[in-house]
UniProtKB/Swiss-Prot annotation:
Zn finger (CCHC-type) location: 548-565
Protein's UniProt name: DEAD-box ATP-dependent RNA helicase 35
Gene3D superfamilies: P-loop containing nucleotide triphosphate hydrolases
Lineage of source species: Eukaryota, Viridiplantae, Streptophyta, Embryophyta, Tracheophyta
Disulfide bond entries: none
Record family assignment: Belongs to the DEAD box helicase family. DDX41 subfamily.
CDD domains found in the cross-reference section: DEADc_DDX41, SF2_C_DEAD
């Protein structure tokens, strides 16, 4: 019985092969299921670690990024705006751009300062610059020279300077002339009436003379030196300065140098005759110069010296494309000089693309008013201005300059003054060349007491002994105001500038004027003193960024974010793009 029970206990149920296989397969599947579940969980954990939610990411970023103050944010915004504005096509010729030519070293000249000046230590040089209030930037800057004799000019040039009453160089000449004579590219910033013209005219004559003595210019060749000016009047004035120094050199036995005034309003045939004989020096306005180059009447193959006078006007929107076209015609490296009383950061950044290792010579802040001018600002109602003008003319003896924003005001004032028996002449862009020349020559000669003009006469024109400048209206741009009042107080003489303001002027313009008066230590009228001034709060931004006022136009009463000039130019660009898009002329092109 027991043996039967043992057998029953040890009995193993028979499982068929098919069933065993099915059980084994089921176990395998179960194991796989568990493994896949574990893998899924592991993958989920990995994903959770690798990809946090956007909210988590944003929180982490905020935590990781250091806090930026409001001041730093404004500085970054302004920096981006300036980079965007300066990101334009460089001032290089088509050939240079096509071949990828970049000049890394300035042009060499044979000029060297005397040994005793070369031996001056850097401390001695800096001391001279400090005494003359000269600020320089750049590498390997030539030393300042305090007299014309040490600059090694020929005797006829020195005699002509003496005849003109120029015995000692002005601050811009002390540093600017050695820089240019050494062959360096330069940005010259100095207030009007500081002697900028001689700084680029004298070295150009020396270079032309040197080239002529080495290899005389053949018929149809030239120019060697080119000066570009924004207005016909300024070009004519510069040309006259060139002629004043060229004539004595010829009389002293030096090779003759031919110079050409290349401006509109003059018959092109007479200009072409000079070019055909071979020309050394050309003083031009952008329009006529561009025309002659495009028609292949003149070439810049031999040109090695270029000056942009009143560069802020030339490189600005008005003449920017014309200047680019002029640069397209250069065949080799040239020495490039930019001069102006106002040189905003925007223009400096843009212009540096054309310069090789430039030296910046700054005599007084760019855009600062001449300290020899007494500035008087008066609140005058619009309807009372023309009558009050007669009272203002009594402040000083003639000659007096009156500036207006628009041509109609110039004509009205001119007519009113003639009716009142005042010897007056007028110029503006609407008058023909003959009238403009008569007005300027008779005023310069002292035959007329008053010149009424638009801003065409404010850009660099040199009228001797101007006692008084009257701004019939405040210009929209503060740099135009600086140019206007710079017609008086020249060469160390004191002058008066009277400006009429009223509610027609924008607050931004008046704030710029207020800060300019403060900088020049002038009396602030109550109407300006009462203005709500946001720049008082913006002082920390100015200190942090190193830029005082607007980096675009140079105005002290606002920052670049509120610049009226920039806003105006943006709106002009938008309207121009609309014209291009919709068509503004030709077949089916009229709006």
């Amino acid at each position: 019985m027991e043996s039967i029970m043992e057998e029953a206990d040890s009995y193993i149920e028979y499982v068929s092969v098919a069933e065993r296989r099915a059980i084994a397969a089921q176990k395998i599947l179960q194991r796989k299921g568990k493994a896949s579940e574990l893998e899924e969980e592991a993958d989920k954990e990995k994903l959770a670690e690798a990809k946090p939610s956007l909210l988590v990411q944003a929180t982490q970023l905020k935590r990781d990024v250091p806090e930026v103050s409001a001041t730093e944010q404004i500085i970054l915004q302004e920096k981006e705006m300036m980079e965007h504005l300066s990101d334009k096509k460089t001032l290089m010729s088509v050939r240079e751009l096509a071949k990828g030519i970049t000049y890394t070293e300035p042009l060499l000249t044979g000029w060297k300062p005397p040994l005793h000046i070369r031996k001056m230590s850097s401390k001695q040089r800096d001391l001279i610059r400090k005494q003359w209030h000269i600020i320089v930037n750049g590498d390997d800057i030539p030393p300042p020279i305090k007299n014309f004799k040490d600059m090694k000019f020929p005797r006829p040039v020195l005699d002509t300077l003496k005849e003109k009453g120029i015995v000692q160089p002005t601050p811009i000449q002390v540093q600017g002339l050695p820089v240019i004579l050494a062959g360096r590219d330069m940005i010259g910033i100095a207030f009007t009436g500081s002697g900028k013209t001689l700084v680029f005219v004298l070295p150009m004559i020396m270079i032309a003379l040197q080239e002529e003595m080495m290899m005389p210019i053949a018929a149809g060749e030239g120019p060697i030196g080119l000066i570009v000016c924004p207005s016909r009047e300024l070009a004519r004035q510069t040309y006259e300065v060139v002629e004043q120094f060229v004539a004595p050199l010829v009389e002293a036995g030096y090779p003759p140098l031919r110079s050409l005034l290349c401006i509109g309003g003059i018959d092109m045939r007479s200009q072409l005759e000079v070019v055909k004989r071979g020309v050394h020096i050309v003083v031009a306005t952008p329009g006529r110069l561009k025309d002659m180059l495009a028609k292949k009447k003149m070439s810049l193959d031999a040109c090695r010296y270029l000056t942009l006078d009143e560069a802020d006007r030339l490189v600005d929107l008005g003449f920017e494309d014309d200047i680019r076209e002029v640069f397209d015609h250069f065949k080799s490296q040239r020495q490039t000089l930019l001069f102006s009383a106002t040189m905003p950061t925007k223009i400096q950044i843009f212009a540096r693309s054309a310069l090789v290792k430039p030296v910046t010579v700054n005599v007084g802040r760019a855009g600062a008013a001449n300290l020899d001018v007494i500035q008087e600002v008066e609140y005058v109602k619009q309807e009372a201005k023309i009558v009050y003008l007669l009272e203002c003319l009594q402040k000083t003896s003639p000659p007096v300059l009156i500036f207006c924003e628009n041509k109609a005001d110039v004509d009205d004032i001119h007519e009113y003054l003639l009716l009142k028996g005042v010897e007056a002449v007028a110029i503006h862009g609407g008058k023909d060349q003959e009238d403009r020349e008569y007005a300027i020559s008779s005023f310069k000669a002292g035959k007329k007491d008053v010149l009424v003009a638009t801003d065409v006469a404010s850009k660099g024109l040199d009228f001797p002994d101007i006692q008084h400048v009257i701004n019939y209206d405040m210009p929209a741009e503060i740099e135009n105001y600086v140019h206007r009042i710079g017609r008086t107080g020249r060469c160390g003489k004191t002058g008066i500038a009277t400006t009429f303001i009223n509610k027609n002027q924008s607050e931004t313009t008046l704030l710029d004027l207020k800060h300019l008066l403060q900088e020049a230590k002038q009396r602030i009228p109550p109407v300006l003193a009462e203005l709500n001034d946001p720049m008082e709060e913006a002082e920390t931004i100015a200190n942090a960024s190193g830029v005082k006022g607007c980096a675009y136009c140079g105005g002290l009463g606002h920052r670049i974010r509120d610049c009226p000039k920039l806003e105006h130019q943006k709106s002009v660009a938008i309207s121009n793009s609309r014209k291009d898009y919709f068509g503004s002329g030709g077949y089916r092109g009229e709006i």
